Amino acid sequence: MTEVTIHQVPEMRRIRRIHFVGIGGAGMSGIAEVLLNQGYEISGSDLRESDVTRRLAGMGVHVFIGHHATNVDGASVVVNSSAVESGNPELMEAREKRIPIVRRAEMLGELMRYRHGIAVAGTHGKTTTTSLISSILAAGKKDPTFIIGGLLNSAGSNAGLGESRYLVAEADESDASFLHLQPMVSVVTNIDADHMDTYEGDFSKLKQTFIDFLHNLPFYGLAVVCGDDPIVTELIPAISRSVVTYGFNEDSDYRAFDVRQDGSKLRFKVARPEGLATLELFLNMPGKHNVLNATAAVAVASEEKVDDDAIQNGLANFMGVGRRFEIYGEFEVGAGPTAMLVDDYGHHPREVAATIAAVRDGWPDRRLVMVYQPHRYSRTRDLYEDFVEVLSTVDQLVLLEVYSAGEDPIPGADSRHLSRTIRTRGVVDPIFVEGVEGVPAVIKDIVQPGDIIITQGAGNVGTLAKELAKRNLG
């Protein structure tokens, strides 16, 4: 049977040029790349040039730096993300010219409509889990299309157009836009209090939105959910679709056990239902949270009848995702043992705790130096005590000012205030640094032989590890 893609649907053939406002964003750039590979003319704009915009331009995307009304001239449709305000000149021009404007998730939903969609949702672990599922499907010769929120190291991209019916993508709950998706398989890794402004500060609304997302599955679809997460398990009775669970919990359908970590390497087993053989697995990523992410991928692959060898090989050969415990290497510090440099995207207290736990499990005798940049004043305010608690568990803390992500400052939710509160706990004495450019000098002054240095957060702290590596930690 011939596969139907979005470009082969007669109604879509009127669409020629698709313009993305904010094309440098992780989710936007992935969709743009897939559509480009399907034969559409793609243009896009962003406020500043980046590795992502340069890569897209090299592929043939017409990239504008800066937002201007003339950028949408000739566009058949304009795609925007929730980060773009309605007063953006390109959106205003599109409305004036009656050019259709669609949200990023709506376009992803159109891509998914004509394929066997696998959507991965959850507060934490979406990118890694989506990447692991894609890796296993590729190892099983399924050749999936994938759209993820980080750089898949094996592909050198955050998106790829496959020839099969499979499309694997992250489902974003931050603005509830994942409700535009209608996949065949939905994964929920966990549910935590984040992006609460979208849900008017009401956690019950967030939970109901996840239920609504799962009910977008057809009656023959499948929900794969984490049996270790108390909020997820609380929702299971309300899900009127087939459900399989995964986790460390004894009652999970796909149960991870016998976990052994040696540095960044994990070995573990997964017991499976219905007479399926228990799998012995290897993953070159540390942390029990990544065991859960991998077990979710095993559950999806097993339900999709992927061969056991492909599951094992897909995990064993997985090369990781950019900024997800990305190890930059070991660097000489005086005459003693080398110091290791790691970069990680986690910016929620639970994610930071998972990173710290991975270090303590894999390198129990090494000092942990964390350079942390809080992301958004609202998140810092809402989870203030959680941040104080988790950041007090490192050995040395360098605290950058909050990365605003467009928000106005909130009194008491800045990093100077956070630093003072952590200091009063008497466990860690933070070093406050205003901007990333001041960090290399601080690291040079405090680094000790054998240290593990982690640059942590979702803002421009992500540029720091590369700079520190270039300077040999100084």
Swiss-Prot record:
Q: Catalytic activity, per the record?
A: UDP-N-acetyl-alpha-D-muramate + L-alanine + ATP = UDP-N-acetyl-alpha-D-muramoyl-L-alanine + ADP + phosphate + H(+)
Instruction: Report the subcellular localization.
Output: Cytoplasm
Pathway-wise, it operates in: Cell wall biogenesis; peptidoglycan biosynthesis
Which Pfam families does this one have?
A: Mur_ligase, Mur_ligase_C, Mur_ligase_M
Coarse class of the protein's main subcellular location = cytoplasm
- As recorded in UniProt, its EC number(s) are 6.3.2.8
One biological process term in Gene Ontology:
cell wall organization
Q: Which keywords does this chain's UniProt record carry? A: ATP-binding, Cell cycle, Cell division, Cell shape, Cell wall biogenesis/degradation, Cytoplasm, Ligase, Nucleotide-binding, Peptidoglycan synthesis
Identify which top EC class this enzyme belongs to.
Answer: ligase
Superkingdom of the organism of origin = Bacteria
Q: Which residues bind ATP?
A: 122-128
Instruction: Tell me a Gene Ontology molecular-function term this record carries.
Output: UDP-N-acetylmuramate-L-alanine ligase activity
Q: What Gene Ontology cellular-component terms does the record carry?
A: cytoplasm
Q: Which family does it belong to?
A: Belongs to the MurCDEF family.
What is the role of the protein in this entry? Cell wall formation.
Xref: PANTHER family: UDP-N-ACETYLMURAMATE--L-ALANINE LIGASE, UDP-N-ACETYLMURAMATE--L-ALANINE LIGASE-RELATED
Protein name, please? Answer: UDP-N-acetylmuramate--L-alanine ligase
Q: Which organism is it from?
A: Saccharophagus degradans (strain 2-40 / ATCC 43961 / DSM 17024)
What gene codes for this chain?
murC
